[in-house]
Amino acid sequence: MHFKSYFIYTTIFNMAWGAPIPFPDTHSWMRNREREPSEIVKVPCSARAPPCKLTYELNGYFIENGLICYNRASVNYFETCYTGNYDYKLPLHPSFSKFGGHVYLSCDDAILQNVSLVGIQQTEYTSSPLLITNSNSEKISYSNLKTGFLGIVYAVETRACIQPDQAKKPEEIINHGVAIKPSCTDGVLYYINSACEVNVSDQTFSIPSCESVKLPTYDDTIEVCDKGGCQNVTCHPGEICDKYERMDMIMRIKNYQCSHIYRYSLYSIILFFVIVIVFTLITIMNILFFLKPAFWLLKKVLYSMVGLCHRRPVVDEVSVDMSTVRVVDEAEEGLLVVEDSIAPNTNVSDKVKRKGRKVENGLIFIPYVLMILLLVCSAESCQDLVSSISNIERCTNNSCDFISKMKLTLLNTPQDFCFKTSTDVYKIRFNSVRVMCLSVPLYYTNSFKRVISREEWKCFEGEGCRTDGTHSIWGESTSLSFDYCVTDFHIFSYCPAYHYNWKRIEYEPTSSRACTIMKCMDTKFEIVGYIQKNGHVLKELGGITSKYDSPLVSISLSNYNSARMPREYAECDGKAYLRTANDLGSFDKELLGNIQCPTKEDAVVLSSKCKTKILSNEDLPVIRYIERDGVDMLEHVKSEPLKDVLVSSSGISLSTLDLFPVELNLQFKEAITSIITSKISLNGTSCKITGIERKFKKTTVSIESSNKVYLSDILACEGLAVCPMILNNIKKGTCITTTYYSVTVGSMIKCKFIYSGDTLMCKYDVSPLEITVISPSLDVSSFEAVKTSTTNWMELLAGIVKDNPKLSLVASIIPIGLILKTIRSFLDDIRQVD
């Protein structure tokens, strides 16, 4: 909700409750990000933050649960950055009850904005708004604060108190609550008046109020922690009839005992389908009856339109014998004739006369009318991709013309960009975009292990006991090695007091395939598509290049999402990896560095031509061994290869959705008069969302239009991740996405196309993620039943003790009881035999 609508809401409330909340001018430091950005201040940023636990539509830095995190998404405005340490204990505004996922006050509040761009500056004791301006963005980029905080970041779920005077801190309510043991049913945690942390496997969720909260994800056992400690809680499945309202039709039929009105519901469904069939038949009959009159009316309208274009010939102005006239030119005024023709021209005057074109009727204009209609229809696939446009006057030798410069932003492909000049209609088709980073090798490296190959004791120092590798008592080695000396003092040594221990450390390769550290030197791109003029292909687009040139336009790459395309990377075995400060490992926990070899052959064997490079605060050129046994062995860095990145001999390239948004610079050689965009009618379009919530890529959004359409857009729905929706002259389309939080099943939620801005209501039929806990059935009535049981008794007893330590004594008695019962059964069998 925007601030203006919120102020109307609060004004109505305050007629009975009090004065409105005194907010400062929020447009300058707090902007809603659920609407189209009216103004963007781009912030160059090199900050680092852990990834966010939830996923949002925008790419950038977020305040989530009171902490700064980084969210990676396809929509990137490059407008967030921060420096310093954010302190969530300093509230940004005294009336905020919740900000950035952290609860400050407990009061009767209202939502201000779900996601907002906020400028914040903090000192050691206070927090205040920061104006979102270019100067402040530069200040954030170049500052390095040790204390305090500066930032322009996204904040989630901002709420404010309607009556700030009645607000209480959450601790005041929690301290007066009743402490009970937490319980969990169907993923809903109940823990009255208690702030807690919930651990589910390796995930941790901080929840301000655990009174009744649906967990983002859960397991059969979760851990709930508060001020009093942590305790394990079992998430029990609810009764089957409790889920009756969330069941689909088939499940309700199977569980008919849960509903007393099932029979009436079934009759209602049958009646509904009968009504639908009857109305469908009536609609079909109406179409059949009105189809022939509709065509007749269309014919009359076309004849009426072309009849207005009919022009009768003006033959009475001049009488010309065409056999005696030589035509020089046919201009707008008519036929030009001259006196000095080959013919005598005795019947023509000196001045130019007009001859009307004879047209029998207006039917000749019907093809032109149909062509105009086709042009309008073809524009339905066009989108407004323009970020900026300007017309520039260019003059040469006193003659001037205009050229148009334009910047386009692509969020997905395929896309069509259509425009008009003074004479023609053009369309540029973008089927796909690929960016390639042309790279050169910086050096070659390999993973290694340390081996002490030589060791010798000396009683005299000789030329000196060095630890920096500048002197050695041995000759040079053919492999990469390091010689150093350690001085030690022992009273009972064979040397007088001091002795000197010389060691040679050799670095042996642990891989037969060396890696190459590459650096991107130039960026080129490829567009697969074409340029069309008046329905005819003017130029095909394709091939890696730095610029596309055509008789109409030149296209170059301006910007792209480089998160998956690093400037420097490690190429190992045909795959690309992020380059870290230590490449393939570290020398010890505080000393980072790498081995650099001039050729790949040297890196395979780690020859003496390789060098060790160290990165530290002192910027030491070589390793200094201070501890007795030298450095620790290499700790390998476990990393995954860059996803969807293709490696070639020229460099790396990327063509997936991770590449977007892509910005292109276009320079036209003709002035553009207008941009043609599509306006797709969504009337009669149905939309349905199905799948399983909180499972990655397990939700499907399906739309069906009443007629065939061209559509390539980004669909954003409430509670769902954005997904690309593409329809190529078809009626139905689907896209796969992820549902992040629950919405009532069967309700209608609002979805929006990012390019066109059109909205669509979709029916939400996503099944909640449920778990079922099945307990084993145990039979201890006889020794035969115990012997044939598939139950692992040791695991069962260990689970009993783990879930409830108080039962450890009882669990230890169970085996003894089974043994006694078995002996008793055996004695009874003997008595029966006797």
From Swiss-Prot:
Site (Cleavage): S381, C382
Listed Pfam families: Tenui_PVC2
Record InterPro entries: Tenui_PVC2
Superkingdom assignment: Viruses
Modification after translation, per record: Specific enzymatic cleavages in vivo may yield mature proteins including glycoprotein G1 and glycoprotein G2.
Misc remark: This putative envelope glycoprotein shares many similarities with bunyavirus glycoproteins. Still tenuivirus virion have never been observed as enveloped.
Protein name: Putative envelope glycoprotein
Organism: Rice stripe virus (isolate T) (RSV)
Lineage: Viruses, Riboviria, Orthornavirae, Negarnaviricota, Polyploviricotina
